[in-house]
Amino acid sequence: MRERFCDILRSTGRENIDYVIEDLEADGFFEAPASAQGHGSYPGGLTEHSLNVYDAAMSMREALLKLRPDLESALSPDSIAIAALLHDVCKADFYTLARRKKKNEIGVYENVDVYEIHDERFPIGHGEKSAMLVLRSGLDISEEELLAIRWHMGPWNLSRDDEKFYRQASRISPLPPLIHAADTMASAILERPAAKI
């Protein structure tokens, strides 16, 4: 998975992409979970989730271009790769492993490993943090890609101003709503355990 992730990023030919990959490695991105208890809550889950978002976004792009061929340049494969693969970089170095008591299937408490969130190191919003970390790595990134990373969570739990900004970002480029939809599809459908379907 790590190799495929890095190969896709490098295929964009972006200046400083190797610095981004170095920073991801240093922050533990490739070993990190995607969430504390939900989708991808295991080592490497974040890499798997990011690739699922990329695959979902590329599939949606293909379907959208059949309906709207004029969107081809606005939904370039390189922009989708950058936004989809880097939308959750803020989750690297965000979770720590802890031991908790939890009831098993027969009601007996046992020690289990769980992830806990530790965001006190850089407490800033989820989408904003990912966008800042990508910029901090020196990546040559477009405004549309930044908007897609910033708004990948969609219009949930936003202030009135933030709802307005989300709508504005969606009018500027189709990339933010595409990445939001792909992220939702990956976490809520593709990564759902088969037993829960």
Predicted ranges, named:
Residues 1-32:
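Non-catalytic interface/linker regions that flank or bridge core catalytic/transmembrane domains
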Residues 42, 48, 60, 72-195:
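Divalent metal-dependent catalytic cores for phosphoryl transfer on phosphate-bearing substrates
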Residues 63-71:
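Inter-helical turn/loop segments and adjacent helix faces that build the functional surface
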